[in-house]
Amino acid sequence: MTLDFRNVNMLWSSIIAETLSRLGLTTAIICPGSRSGPLAVAFAQHPDIEAIPVLDERSAAFFGLGIARRKGLPVVLVCTSGTAGANFYPAVIEAEASGVPLLLLTADRPPELRHCQAGQAIDQVKLYGHYPRWQVELALPSTHPEMLAYLRQTCVYAWEQSQRPVPGPVHLNIPFRDPLAPISDLETESLAATFDIDQFFAAVHPLPSVQISLDLQTTNVYLDQWMSCDRGLIIAGPAQPDTPEHYCLAIAQLAHILGWPVLAEGLSPLRNWADRNSYLISTYDLILRNPTIASQLQPQQVISIGALPTSKVLRVWLTQSRAQTWVVDVSDHNMDPLHGLSIPVRISVEGLITSIPAAKKEHCQPLTAYAKSWLNANHSVRTLINRAMQKQSELIESKIAWLLSQILPPRTPLFIANSMPVRDIEYFWQPGTLHIQPYFNRGANGIDGTLSTALGMSHRQQSSVLLTGDLALLHDTNGFLLQDYWQGHLTIIVVNNGGGGIFQMLPISAFDPPFERFFRTPQQVQLKHLAATYQAKWTLIQSWAHLQQALNPLPESGLHILEISCDCQNDTQWRRIFFKECVKSL
């Protein structure tokens, strides 16, 4: 690329774009504004960066988060000065909490135009509090060689900090004086003749991969403790690994070395690679609702991989067990919300397996009697689930998750909205071999940005699916504005039960008023008309066969809303009755 020497702001911005491109940046999301003009021009004209204009900053940030999560590389977000950057905040929180790399470039007025009512100026320094992995305000643009080198190296460091030691957001606040347009300045243009671009960027390359492993002594200490325990348990929580197969194989190998069962959350890829792990338990939430069985299955040791599953039943049971726990995760967060007897092991499960000596991998423990008890209970509950779902001809919310686990095209990317969908996935998603790719925002667990994140996940991806409730979709309708530049296909399965169905499952539902108006928040939006407004295809699903037909095959482009109308109270009653049947059956 040729740097832009038309003026100091354009040179400054083009060095930012070129440095990040050489490091591996492929996507920049640009929100409209004047102060960010130099950055917008630099990214828009870069031949190796896809620059995507997005009107709404909140939607833009979640869209970028979806792309970054899928690619495993940072995405740049650009906005103008003032309140624009504040709209990035929810996605910044989610990115920090769930470990997604983002580079936030907020343009700003120069220091002399701040705190003096100059207009469109707020305090943007440390705008996102403690959430960024790193944050800095850049110096004002300069053509001095030392300042250009400073800019390049700051970008290199920002790129690194967004990925190591733990991925997350990085914020660069970038002040500009006029001119903001690429107006020619002869003094700056004259630098082009003597500027050696190749030498300037000679040391800028993508980061080398790093594999972290445990030292042999620590590994052996842990293994000796684990292999001496015949009531051990592995718990695999929500996970979106870059290479799901390697992740699943690592957990399967650990389970077979120890002879321990694996409780796998529905948001873990383990349930979609079930052929890799014969010790898989998917119905733990339903099993543990039986107090007698729950007492019999108390563990002595637990290896918890990543965040805990969503299940409150599981969390209460673990708290009561007071088992010695090892939390395996590269994150520097406190990963123990139960405040138990836990030891943090700051490594990936793949790194843990790499650390285990080959000799110990070859001498696997036999399946424990404890593990067999789990597997027997799991078989009984799975049989009950399948029998109940096969008999269920009426459209109910819970069957959607069960059916999708079996009928989606292989390797389909599936974004699962928060609230009730993630819980039904945990209860009813069946283990299989379709290698479905689950995506979700379980860092802060909010419903904001649902559609925009799903669109980011599916951008330039194979045909994808979003499973969402009506309120989560309506909360992010600005995401539909992304269609002009988004490329791909997204089928949006909307459970329309006229409000927040999850609250029907909570104790507050017995207190009406104020429950109906202030918690369930009924809505009467006609999704058919909403789809027409944004030129999306819409279909009202009439039966389970109709749903299966609509998903096989998935279209190759555009948006398709599949509305499934459900009765909220009926769905709640069905779950309660079925949960009681599970307790009785064990």
Swiss-Prot record:
GO BP annotations, alphabetical order: menaquinone biosynthetic process; phylloquinone biosynthetic process
InterPro entries with a match to the protein in the record: MenaQ_synth_MenD (IPR004433), MenD_middle (IPR032264), THDP-binding (IPR029061), Thiamin_PyroP_enz_TPP-bd_dom (IPR012001)
One Pfam family matching this protein: TPP_enzyme_M_2
E.C. no: 2.2.1.9
Catalytic activity, as annotated: isochorismate + 2-oxoglutarate + H(+) = 5-enolpyruvoyl-6-hydroxy-2-succinyl-cyclohex-3-ene-1-carboxylate + CO2
Cofactor(s) this protein requires: Mg(2+); Mn(2+); thiamine diphosphate
Coiled-coil ranges (or none): none
Record note on cofactor: Binds 1 thiamine pyrophosphate per subunit.
EC category name: transferase
An annotated Gene Ontology molecular function: 2-succinyl-5-enolpyruvyl-6-hydroxy-3-cyclohexene-1-carboxylic-acid synthase activity
SUPFAM superfamilies xref list: Thiamin diphosphate-binding fold (THDP-binding)
Keywords attached to this entry: Magnesium, Manganese, Metal-binding, Thiamine pyrophosphate, Transferase
Pathway this chain belongs to: Quinol/quinone metabolism; 1,4-dihydroxy-2-naphthoate biosynthesis; 1,4-dihydroxy-2-naphthoate from chorismate: step 2/7; Cofactor biosynthesis; phylloquinone biosynthesis
Role, per record: Catalyzes the thiamine diphosphate-dependent decarboxylation of 2-oxoglutarate and the subsequent addition of the resulting succinic semialdehyde-thiamine pyrophosphate anion to isochorismate to yield 2-succinyl-5-enolpyruvyl-6-hydroxy-3-cyclohexene-1-carboxylate (SEPHCHC).
Family classification: Belongs to the TPP enzyme family. MenD subfamily.
Subunit structure: Homodimer.
HAMAP family in alphabetical order: MenD
Protein name, as recorded: 2-succinyl-5-enolpyruvyl-6-hydroxy-3-cyclohexene-1-carboxylate synthase
Source organism of the structure: Acaryochloris marina (strain MBIC 11017)
Name of the gene this protein is made from: menD
